[in-house]
Structures are given as C-alpha cells and as structure tokens.
C-alpha cells in the first residue's frame, strides 16, 4: 500500500503503477485522473476543479470523499474499456455526479455500490436524456445507464444505501437513475441493466424545470426503460421540489418496490409514484403527500401492476388526483385515507399539459381493478369535483370510511355508462 498526502505524491503513485493507494488528509487542486485497472483508492478527501476520478475496470473506491463543482462528474468511467469488471464504491461521498455509462466500447461490467452519498450535483446540462411517453428525463446525481443499442451488452449491479441531495441542497436533476437502452416510446430495446437490489436512503431533488414545460421530467428514484430491478427498497424519505419532478418513477421492470419512509412532492405536476413499466408488487408503508397543482399521488399510466398497497395518500393542489388507474391491475389497497382538497387545475399528462380535477380515485375507461380495499375513506374537499370517478371496472370493493365530498358543487360518486362497480353498503356523502 502506498500512502499519499499531496497531488504530486498521488500522481507519482499512479505513474508507478501502485495498486493500493491510501489518501491521507485532503488533497486539493489535483487534476482529474484515470485509475488503472485493478487499482484501489481509499481514505481522505480529493478536491477537484473539474472532472474527478475516472474508473477503468476492477477498481475500488472506499472510505473516500471526492469533491468537485456541482456541474461536474466526481466519479465517471472510461468508456474505451470493453469490460468494466467489477467497479466497487464503498463508503463514498461526493459533490458532483457519479455516472457509470455503457457506451463506446463498454460491453459488460458489474457495479457494487454500498453506502454512497451524493451531497449535491447539478446534471441539468447533460446532453443525453432518455425519452419516452412524450418526455425527456433528466439524468441523476447517481446514474447507472447502459446506452448501448446492442441487447447483448449487459450491465449488472447491486446498489445499497444510495443517497442523493439534502433538504438544504437538493440534487438539480434526478436523484438516483438506473436505466438501459430504450426506444422513443419509452420501451427497452437494446442494452440492459440488471440490478438485484436497489436500496435507497434519503433523496432530495429539484429538476428546476420551468413551470408548464410539457416535455421534460425528473425523478427522485427513477428506474428507466431497459432496466430490470428485482427489488427496490426506498428506506429513506424521498422528496422532490420542482415542476414535473416525479418522486418514485418506473419505466422499466421491477419485481417488488417497497417504500418505508415519506414520499413527498412539493412542485406542480409531480407524482408520488408513477408506473409506466412492469411492476409486480408495490408496497408504500409511509404517507404519499403532494402539495403542488396537478401533482397526483399515484398513477398507473401504462404497463402492468399486480398488487399495490399504500398507507395513505393526500394531495392539496388543484388538478391533483389522489389515485388514477388507467390500465388493468390486480389488488389495490390503502390502509388509511385517500384525500384531495384542490379543485380544477393543469397537470402534465404524457407530454401534454391538461386540465384535471382533484378526484380522490379515478378508474378510467381503460383501467380496471380486480379488488379495491380502502381502510379509511375516499374524500375530496375542492369545488366542483368528484371523489370517486369510475369509467372502467372494479371487482370486489371495500371502503370502510365511505366516500365523501364536501366542496361546493361537488359529488361523491360518478359512474360512467359502461363502468362496472358495486358500491352497495358503502356510505356515500355529498354536499346538500
């Protein structure tokens, strides 16, 4: 092991081919450098003015802090390497983006990340953005992305305890971004990423997208098309602050997604959880709260979903639907209430700003629910809104606290001519 404490000593160690380098203290002003294959770098703090550490193959970064400008990449990879081997990040803190890409010559690799924290980053200026469902998506402070069109190119990963941003300094862009190659419709059609476990800590993001922009979004935790994640565990609170900032978003394929801490959106046209991809089981064991106009709680826009359970969902903005189901799904359960307090307002829908009303639960003509169980109540408080709107179908229904509308000109239930739902025995309350 070689110990270094100055930029020159670090450069000398790299030039000499040292395979195990310990940084003692803080090294400021070093130019960005490439870590040779098989090299381990650990300890201390590195301060850069531009790009930081470029990984090649079988590298380890451990117990280290890497700082650069928010707009730069603190950790990136050499895309001229065919096989990344195993890139290990353990107990790593950065200011600036962590970005691992499969492009150019990269065709394989595994990423093992444990206790990784991006203090803040600004990725709004990145040229490459995945596109789907009428929008581009901003990269994340932590980004793992297979951009190769060839489906034979495969990355794998285990990502444990990844955090991004703070309440005082959110990441500008998405937070944690995992994706493969997708087509313009948002469906995977090339290189893939397979993650066995994605476990996230605290995440704070602000895409800083101008209000009413129709074709750009970000996500706090974002599984992009071309990514398969066996298990997602959102163990820390995830909060987004700006327009079009989704909190939890799936375009890919996820086995089980569990959230055990608050899911919160403070910007217009944000969504607590939105699904466009394949998702077997969703279990949100903490409140979903949105406060912006057009900011929905949960939306099954597209794809598949077998089972979803929520603790509670509350929206306060105009046009902020609590739950909207636009595709067939299995069981939908909410332990507590689904409550909205807004009226009519604009909301982003697949790349178009549309006028919506703050319905508590909407099952559209293309949507269906095999079994619906609400442990609390469905409630709306806005003017001229509907609490429960059904144009599709629902199987067995249980709403323990009933369906309630309290706003002027509002009604508790609206059922379309071709809809199918049995509300017998359920308490329905509309304003007199």
PLM regions: where:
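Acidic Gly/Asp/Thr-rich repetitive segments characteristic of extracellular carbohydrate-active
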Residues: 1-24
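Leucine-rich repeat
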Residues: 6-10, 99-100, 246, 321
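Extracellular beta-strand-rich solenoid/capping regions of secreted or surface-exposed proteins
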Residues: 15-16, 28-42, 46-85, 96-106, ...
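Beta-strand-rich solenoid/repeat architectures in extracellular/passenger domains
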Residues: 42-48, 62-74, 89-100, 114-139, ...
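Long, low-complexity intrinsically disordered regions in eukaryotic proteins
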Residues: 145-146, 179-181
């Amino acid at each position: 092991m070689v110990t270094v404490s100055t930029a020159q000593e670090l450069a000398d160690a790299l030039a000499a081919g040292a395979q195990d380098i310990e940084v003692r203290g803080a090294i400021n002003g070093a130019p960005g450098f490439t870590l040779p294959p098989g090299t381990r770098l650990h300890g201390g703090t590195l301060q850069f003015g531009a790009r930081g550490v470029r990984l090649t193959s079988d590298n380890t970064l451990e117990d280290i802090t890497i700082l650069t400008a928010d707009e730069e990449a603190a950790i990136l990879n050499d895309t001229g390497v065919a096989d990344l081997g195993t890139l290990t990040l353990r107990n790593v803190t950065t200011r600036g983006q962590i970005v691992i890409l499969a492009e150019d010559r990269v065709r394989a690799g595994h990423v093992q990340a444990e206790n990784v924290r991006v203090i803040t980053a600004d990725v709004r200026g990145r040229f490459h953005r995945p596109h789907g469902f009428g929008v581009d998506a901003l990269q994340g402070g932590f980004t793992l992305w297979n951009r190769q069109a060839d489906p034979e190119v495969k990355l794998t990963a285990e990502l444990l305890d990844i955090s991004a941003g703070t309440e005082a300094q959110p990441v500008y862009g998405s937070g944690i971004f995992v994706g493969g190659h997708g087509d313009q419709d948002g469906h995977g059609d090339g290189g893939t990423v397979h993650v066995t476990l994605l476990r996230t800590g605290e995440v704070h993001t602000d895409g800083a997208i101008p209000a009413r922009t129709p074709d750009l979004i970000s996500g706090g935790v974002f599984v992009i098309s071309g990514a398969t994640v066996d298990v997602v565990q959102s163990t820390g609170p995830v909060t987004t602050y700006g327009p079009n900032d989704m909190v939890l978003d799936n375009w890919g394929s996820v086995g089980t997604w569990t959230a055990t801490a608050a899911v919160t959106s403070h910007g217009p046209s944000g969504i607590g959880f939105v699904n466009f991809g394949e998702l077997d089981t969703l279990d949100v064991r903490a409140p979903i709260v949105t406060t912006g106009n057009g900011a929905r709680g949960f939306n099954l826009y597209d794809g598949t979903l077998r089972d979803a359970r929520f603790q509670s969902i509350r929206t306060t903005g105009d046009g902020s639907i609590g739950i909207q189901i636009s595709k067939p799904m299995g069981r939908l359960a909410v332990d507590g209430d689904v409550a909205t307090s807004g009226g009519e307002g604009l909301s982003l829908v697949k790349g178009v700003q549309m006028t919506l009303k703050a319905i508590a639960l909407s099952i559209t003509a293309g949507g269906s629910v095999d079994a619906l169980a609400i442990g609390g109540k469905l409630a709306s408080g806005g003017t001229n809104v509907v609490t429960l709107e059904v144009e599709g179908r629902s199987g067995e229904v249980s709403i323990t606290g009933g369906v309630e509308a309290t706003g002027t000109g509002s009604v508790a239930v609206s059922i379309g001519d071709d809809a199918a739902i049995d509300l017998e025995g359920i308490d329905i309350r509309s304003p007199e």
